[in-house]
Amino acid sequence: HKKMATNNTTEQSLTKKVWSLATTLAGQGIGFTDYITQLTYLLFLKMDAENVEMFGEESAIPTGYQWNDLIALDDLDLVKQYEETLKLLSEQDNLIGTIYTKAQNKIDKPVYLKKVITMIDEEQWLIMDGDVKGAIYESILEKNGQDKKSGAGQYFTPRPLIQAIVD
């Protein structure tokens, strides 16, 4: 049961962090969908770096456009590097290119982009239980649905689809 308790704590604290940042960004005019999209792009970069670090795998991301190239930067340099990374990755002729199809940065204020990157960098995502990642994703979609004033807040993402995304 110890693992379960840890998962719940991790899940709750991470959901809180991710949601808190969504609220902050919404105040800056960055919509929830844009935030989740950027989070996905950045998480992919971070998990690629973890794969290299922990398992000695070769990076799927071209040199000069990897996670460590991004986290080292601040201010406009960070925004510029992130935008160049998205552009380059969207032009790849493989799965990476598919993942980053028409990818664009929607968090153009450096301070907020840095906050998202820092939050992602503070966690080890690759070794995190798939159920935890799925639960975080699910609860954030649900919370967004509850917080939407437009009434367009229903979400019907089937659990197996979420599983496929996070595993």
Label each region the model flagged.
Residues H1-D167:
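Non-catalytic, mostly N-terminal accessory regions of nucleic-acid modification and defense proteins
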